[in-house]
């Protein structure tokens, strides 16, 4: 197991859930924090602050460990928009280009999706975009570069039989082109592998 994978598994154990939904995630076998000797019943109950903090950290980690400043700014934009702040926040996060590539199952992980973007393997409406935080909009097309179509992890991700693509996205396996059809209609439509507790995240930044 590589150091990077070990690091990711430690994140899941520290946050008490499989942040990225990996079947082999260490949290599935060791449901206690790194450094803790076994599942001790003497561990104190988390405070309200720690619950809110963990919810925020889980969400940040799920989207590839977004830097705090960038994540906070995203929340500020969500709060200024009309409507429900929690749904606005999720909508903004789901519009990130790296998140869209990940949701389309073009890449096996959010980190691999981000690399595809940063290495200029992704086109939006025919234009190469190498900014992971770039926000796509309804109707945008997401296309792989010719070189990316030959990358083993991309081929492997697309050829998986158990691929699940959210209804607000679409992907043409033959043309290697995806579409951001619309915004998620609700938080429950987003395929989080854990309870995202978005309201706790909103409360954390609103305190």
From Swiss-Prot:
Q: From its record, what is one biological process in GO terms?
A: ribosomal small subunit biogenesis
> Which InterPro entries does this UniProt record tie to the protein?
Ribosomal_uS4, Ribosomal_uS4_bac-type, Ribosomal_uS4_CS, Ribosomal_uS4_N, S4_RNA-bd, S4_RNA-bd_sf
Specify whether rRNA-binding is a keyword of the entry: yes
Region annotation Disordered: where it falls in the sequence: 26-49
- CDD domains from the UniProt entry: S4
Skewed-composition ranges (Polar residues): 28-39
| The keyword Cell wall biogenesis/degradation appears for this protein | no
Q: Which UniProt keywords apply?
A: Ribonucleoprotein, Ribosomal protein, RNA-binding, rRNA-binding
Q: Name one GO molecular function term.
A: rRNA binding
Q: Domain S4 RNA-binding, which positions?
A: 95-158
Task: Tell me which HAMAP family the record gives.
Answer: Ribosomal_uS4_B (MF_01306_B)
**Belongs to which family?**
Belongs to the universal ribosomal protein uS4 family.
Purpose: One of the primary rRNA binding proteins, it binds directly to 16S rRNA where it nucleates assembly of the body of the 30S subunit.
Q: How does it assemble?
A: Part of the 30S ribosomal subunit. Contacts protein S5. The interaction surface between S4 and S5 is involved in control of translational fidelity.
The protein's name in its UniProt record:
Small ribosomal subunit protein uS4
Q: Organism source for this protein? A: Orientia tsutsugamushi (strain Ikeda)
């Amino acid at each position: 197991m590589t150091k990077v994978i070990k690091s990711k598994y430690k994140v899941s154990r520290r946050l008490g859930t499989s942040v990225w939904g990996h079947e082999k995630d260490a949290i599935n076998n060791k449901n206690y924090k790194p450094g803790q000797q076994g599942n001790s019943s003497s561990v104190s109950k988390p405070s309200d602050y720690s619950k809110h903090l963990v919810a925020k950290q889980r969400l940040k980690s799920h989207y590839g460990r977004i830097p705090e400043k960038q994540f906070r700014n995203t929340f500020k934009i969500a709060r200024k928009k009309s409507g429900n702040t929690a749904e606005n926040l999720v909508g903004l996060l789901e519009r990130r280009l790296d998140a869209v590539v990940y949701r389309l199952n073009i890449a096996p992980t959010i980190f691999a999706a981000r690399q595809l973007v940063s290495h200029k393997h992704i086109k939006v409406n025919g234009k190469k975009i190498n900014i992971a935080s770039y926000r796509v909009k309804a109707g945008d097309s997401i296309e792989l570069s010719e070189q990316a179509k030959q990358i083993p992890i991309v081929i492997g991700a697309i050829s998986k039989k158990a691929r699940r693509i959210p209804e607000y996205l679409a992907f043409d396996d033959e043309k290697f082109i995806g579409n951001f059809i619309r915004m998620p209609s609700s938080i429950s439509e987003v395929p989080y592998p854990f309870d995202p507790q978005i309201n706790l995240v909103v409360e954390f930044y609103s305190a």
